[in-house]
């Protein structure tokens, strides 16, 4: 049954969880919810409530705050109240006054000054408000009275009118005094705010270093008795009145509510689960504590647990919070500290969670002197490890865990001279209790004796293992306990088999396994080991057929049509293997002329042998700086030359580059441990000879081996470890105890579980329970090896790792300076190019300002070795221009006049000036009186009468190379997207293929991806996590390496006097062995300061300019930059011949780069720019952070300054301050700090205030800015934009053809072909969805806006034509018609579009069937084209005519 309005209000009170003192307000008993209006588009809910009387102000604000907080995840809220009140209460009226004014939406300093000074009062039946003069009275009546009265009405007040009353005693002087006082107060408040921010930041920094506030632990509310029981978070599953929890803060947010109060939102965990904790501030004291609370702190919280009905989650509403200390893991060992020599960071792909910095910091706290990094297959943590080691004073051991492979596995063991065809063979197979020849035993031994391909005898015996078989063994082998119980003993069966084999050639599939068990049994029973030749059919198949995906016995017998039943029963396997052997030997003779046993190993290690070899883990540790370079080469080879499913490293490659590298035996996946586990001491001893040190790990790390029954029990595991220690002693090689760390603390294990779970069943780690592999302390490791005795444990855990670390040099993995390539004569060429062009433009005798600027720049560029960087860029730009593609510059390169003179950029950074192309007269404007040379009035040369060129944008060189000109130049160039691959490949011509690489990137798990992993883990493990716990688990799973990639534009250039391995290993992006370019293995940011990176970007603007030029024949460089028709676009639509209503935009800039978005069009509507320099301002304002909104916008709207005067681009700051007389160096430094959002130091602020030319608003504006755009970048972009806009105004069909061809990727051809009505209907359909519109629909809406404008300007868009349409570009059919390309058809990709055109060029399509077959067009696309009358002339099927038959 529906609740009545009063009951609804009571339900609402429960949901928003008001504090008890407010919830019991008597007036709430009769409160009603009259209506809730849901505004879907704006995501706002309006609550219409009714009460008997107006609520006390404190009650209202508390109610509003909790209502906002309760609905924060759903929508914004607003409240409208009606009451039965007939009379006004003066006290209540006054209490609400400031709130009503602040929420009126009226942005007027006059009103807010009035609010601060006066309050309305009741006199008789009137409500009066004292004002000072007629100006204020008129303002209040015209602009504020109605709005404020309506504001009171919405809060439940009865109707009334506020009458302004002039205070006759107030003189003009008092007004001026008041304003002066207010100005002082404002300045004081601004200063106080700045100081508060500084104090807050200082407090945070202090907390980071000290861990607690200056005056002790934080306490909010009442203290919490230490004896009060603390609930484990996972135990709380329903609402409770009062509980205490204790947890670690992993996320924090402070929200400022409309009332001005603050809401603290903490996310806390005790690692059993997590909770969201909320608390409202009561006063300024609470707010200061809110600021002091930070992530990483531990708190006890007492409060109530309540269900958030909308979020459907339990949250804690805190009453009391107390900061507490939390016990941390310690390393209390006194007899030396351990060194971890096997450790994985978050660069071990999807397998470890913590960055190396976390481990190094912990090692430092524990007093551990060194730490190794040994990620799987990669070295990508090295740069961060180096930085962390320097910061924390910990020595870094640089290593990697690789997949080591033998250079081919023998096909035959125990070679002898024996003709294959005439040999007698015994093909044997064993079934065993497990995989270890040492700890398991044979339970069935079967064989067949064969001559000439026929079975002549057989052998099949069970062996009693003298212990019950496990369920796993029975499942795998089909052998039961009943079958082996009471069978012959091992000694008897093996003696019989030895006699059966005689002198025959033995064979088997994966025979090394069977040989291992057979020889182990022979050894136990004093029988001679096998010395017969033993052929492995697995390796013989791999040698003959490396192309096969697998070489399993069942796969091969099917391929060779050999019947195989009861696979994994020894007798069936042996016979099948025998027949397979004869077929393979026949192929070996035919293909490779192998006819003798001695020949079968001749091709071992030939070809792509590494693909067939079984990898084993090994750790490679750089011992010297030369060893590090060898390590770089080895890892590069494993990722490029020997990659197969994973990077692999042949032993021969390691042997060739082993100098300066120590090789460790690694984990249970290493060959030494595996040999000990499966084949015994002697085999492990033999394998260990290859290694420099032997690793053993805690039994907990080997736990999966027990679970998978690879090791029988704990005693067997201890025996393996003891025997590995004996191997080390026997070979005089150190044995070290390592932890195989994959995360920092035990509680972090869940993150690794989630990551590995996300990989699915393909990841072998998902097949058993994950071991405990946290970063262990010395104490933990000594305890883990206490079964060896204290002395030996100390040796393995502490002494031996220290000995190895002492053998390793202090190694530097990244360079400490920039190494640029050398080009012979680069300095002279740059000087010549620069001066030749300067003289060409400015005459034989350069103007002083030009000469001084060039001298200054060339000295910096040549002196710091940057000439080659400029010359490379010049050659790239020159070639692109020669090939017909303009290049746009990005960033600050346009700040360099040398870049302008050498043709790298079109942007001229000199002050605005006139320049005569005939007699070289020039006139410069150096005092900031003109914003851009393009804004100068047209003028003829006073010397010769030639129309003067206009140029110069007043951009300081310092913004590019720093104040001292020694900052490495970062030249970013925008090439056409079509031309970008050509430009990239041209670098190979310039420097050689082995000296250029793509800049590598590392893709890590992002927030949304991690969230998906957590939800999948929650679902698959049938658990339920609170929202806060999902957030914690997702946060812990982010940042882990997921893949690698390449920077879309970055080309790394290696100088010819070095090689790439001096800087970084190399690889293919995302391990794609077919990729066209190799990339740096290190993320390019890690080596950015050491090696030159060219940014050769692909951009749509140059592509569009090229297409416009091709279609029109107009040279884009000839287009004027001050065309009135083009400039009119930025203040209206008249130059397009349409009204704003027709195109749904007041500005004509739809589709104009930089100016087409709704945000920028809104800026244009407010500012109406008319000059190039004002467009520069718009560009800077729109790209900056906190430069327009809440800053320049307010200054313009309040009339403080106009658009041309506000701070737009970063360079403006330096030049403005210099023009105002401030020191050049300080001006530069202020600009640098402001553009990075770092504020301005107090002494610099004072210097600005002391300069009478610097306005106060300018300083305040600087203090708000977080990021600023470079003026050179804005200039280059606007140049391109104006050229494109020129075609939009004067050549519309060419413009729309180019726009749709180059910039648009989402189309609705049906709507576009229907004309204006169809497009407008589709636009409305999308806009009506509001926030629910998909990204694809939002992108489509942008294209539809342009299509609508195109149609309104009289241009028709036609559906595709099967005979005429292009694959990708729109075509101009006549002056008013565009024909769509095939790629504009939904779901018709580029490849199919090209195939249609290619097939059409061969011959016309005869039918829809023909189109489908030759054009590769799907049935769905055929239906689309048919429905839209594209295929009207085509029959469904090919029709055979009489003439076709003749």
Swiss-Prot record:
Residues 425-581 form the Exonuclease domain. Keywords: Cytoplasm, DNA replication, DNA-directed DNA polymerase, Exonuclease, Hydrolase, Nuclease, Nucleotidyltransferase, Transferase. It is found in: Cytoplasm. Signal peptide: none annotated. GO terms for biological process: DNA-templated DNA replication. Its EC number is 2.7.7.7. InterPro entries: DNA_pol3_alpha_NTPase_dom (IPR011708), DNA_pol3_finger (IPR040982), DNA_PolC-like_N_II (IPR024754), DNA_PolC-type_N_I (IPR028112), DnaE2/DnaE/PolC (IPR004805), DNAPol_HHH (IPR029460), DnaQ (IPR006054), Exonuclease_RNaseT/DNA_pol3 (IPR013520). GO terms for molecular function: 3'-5' exonuclease activity; DNA binding; DNA-directed DNA polymerase activity. GO terms for cellular component: cytoplasm. The keyword tRNA processing does not apply. SMART domains: EXOIII, POLIIIAc. It catalyses: DNA(n) + a 2'-deoxyribonucleoside 5'-triphosphate = DNA(n+1) + diphosphate. Transmembrane segments: none annotated. Coiled coil: none annotated. Required for replicative DNA synthesis. This DNA polymerase also exhibits 3' to 5' exonuclease activity. Belongs to the DNA polymerase type-C family. PolC subfamily. This is DNA polymerase III PolC-type. It comes from Latilactobacillus sakei subsp. sakei (strain 23K) (Lactobacillus sakei subsp. sakei).
